[in-house]
Amino acid sequence: MASSQVGDMVNGNAEPTRHLAKFPPSLWGDRFTSFTLDKQLWDKYGNEIEVLKEQVRSMVVAGGRKAAEQINLINVLERLGVSYHFEKEIEEQLEQLFAKFEDNEDYDLFTIALHFRIFRQHGYKMSCDVFNKFRDSNGEFKETVSNDVRGMLSLYEATYLKIRGEGFLDEAHAFTIAQLESLVGGPHLSSDLSEQVMHALKQSIHRGFPRLEAKHFISFYEKDAARNETLLRLAKLDFNQLQLSHREELCHIFRWWKELDLISKVPYARDRAVECFFWSTCAYYEPQHSVGRAVLTKIVLLLSVTDDTYDAYGTYDELKLYTNAVQRWDASAMDELPDYMKTLYRALLNVYDEVERDLAKQGRAYGVHHSKEAFKEIVRSYEIEAEWFKEGYVASFEEYMKNALVTSTGRLHTTSCFMGLEADVATTEAFEWILTKPKMVAASGAIGRLVDDVMSNDEEQERGHVATGLDCYMKQHGVSKQEAIVELYKMIENAWRDINEEMLKPTAISMKLLIHVLNLSRISDVVYKYVDGYTHPEIIKDHVISLFEDPIPM
């Protein structure tokens, strides 16, 4: 992804012409430099949370509740963002509920669709046939469905769990979107329900950032006349306590980044410490993953600057030197680099050394080698794109995607994310699984790459950039830009289908690992949905503030 440049000089006196990207600066100044955790408030939250957790745990395991009531309780716990406290109990309940499920029960559309979504989210392959009773003899939706707003909203959310070959869910997706859009703001919806529908159409549950979606749902749930005050109280306390933890972690990361002072030496690069921490918090938000969030943030930051070096600054000759240095991964390779690259290379080696030391204390350093190898692979693929740009070469779409699945960083992000998990979860076998190039990791990478290609195409081509997947597809198939975008979005949807299918039991590896690959995929949907929100951080600024600064009123 090298930007346009003239005069490949490394050691000559003349500075080569560089076509800089002129990325927007950081939005945050010193906003996150200091933060003092209120220990008294933390303890107050924690003490009440422990009491409420036991009350809720008793609710989850209590007998005598109808299946529909139990599945609704599980849904509320998940949407409130507190289900991670009760994972074992919820899995036991779902196993029993799925084994006993009878589709001849007189369930309405809301309840059937809710069962479908919850079961699929947890790896149980419920058949689409459960929706047949809502279709007429011609296969069309019955008129009663169009009048059931809650049912349509539930079905809409369920369609995001589709896998390949489920044409009905594609039809249901298009149908529910059209119906719900026609009802928003109309006289047939209460303002509260209309607000829920509008949010769902903007961001689905399955593809959303769990912590942000929990905060949204809490605001809806507290207006629900049927709300459970214990659940609501626990959700608010849990969100606010975890927000304090995240804010403290962000402060440490932000100060570390300022002290590293890399951006002052490579000012062409995007300064995105806060956004990278936001990214890492999407990968895993739970309190036990604080080390993982720090590790992943640091690696993503270094990758971001490396990407910008290949994409928007380095000359081809400089980039070849840097690629070779990264393959050697040795401080002595620094001597061959221009000064600005020495700074970046030194930071890369030091950060990985620091990460390895931190993880070694917990017996988890074995994943660092895999992360380094993934970083080396990405840099090799960056150089391939730099060569293509230098030669004006437009690859076939297939050739482009083969390389793009590396530069999409799916392997590096997954490996680096696994490094931050508990040793009994992210075992050596988990890292070996990544080396097999599993379908789920490839699909996650494809989503990120193709969405980014569509959203950043105009801006990148304006400044000079290697042909993107959009350009390659247009040239190979002789189609317009809009036609190519339609085809790329079909590929993105198929990649989501693959992710959903890989999460159905029996899974290749533990669901405790796969959920983080899913979370990494969700980042693409949240950050790149309408525009490149990483390059243009004002797009996700409200998300950052909501997650790290604004507590929920108690």
Curated annotation (Swiss-Prot):
It comes from the Eukaryota. GO terms for biological process: diterpenoid biosynthetic process; sesquiterpene biosynthetic process. It catalyses: (2E,6E)-farnesyl diphosphate + H2O = (2E,6E)-hedycaryol + diphosphate. SUPFAM superfamilies: Terpenoid cyclases/Protein prenyltransferases, Terpenoid synthases. Keywords: Lyase, Magnesium, Metal-binding. A motif (DDXXD motif) lies at residues 307-311. Mg(2+) 2 binds at D307, D311. (2E,6E)-farnesyl diphosphate binds at R270, D307, D311, R449, D452. Pfam families: Terpene_synth, Terpene_synth_C. GO terms for molecular function: magnesium ion binding; sesquiterpene synthase activity. Mg(2+) 1 binds at D307, D311. Specifically expressed in flowers. Its cofactor is Mg(2+). Pathway: Secondary metabolite biosynthesis; terpenoid biosynthesis. Gene3D superfamilies: Farnesyl Diphosphate Synthase, Terpene synthase, N-terminal domain. Binds 3 Mg(2+) ions per subunit. Signal peptide: none annotated. Mg(2+) 3 binds at D452, S456, E460. Its EC number is 4.2.3.174. Belongs to the terpene synthase family. Sesquiterpene synthase that catalyzes the formation of sesquiterpenes and sesquiterpenoid alcohols. Converts farnesyl diphosphate (FPP) to hedycaryol. Hedycaryol is likely to be one of the terpenes that attract insects for pollination of Camellia brevistyla. The Asp-Asp-Xaa-Xaa-Asp/Glu (DDXXD/E) motif is important for the catalytic activity, presumably through binding to Mg(2+). This is Hedycaryol synthase. It comes from Camellia brevistyla.
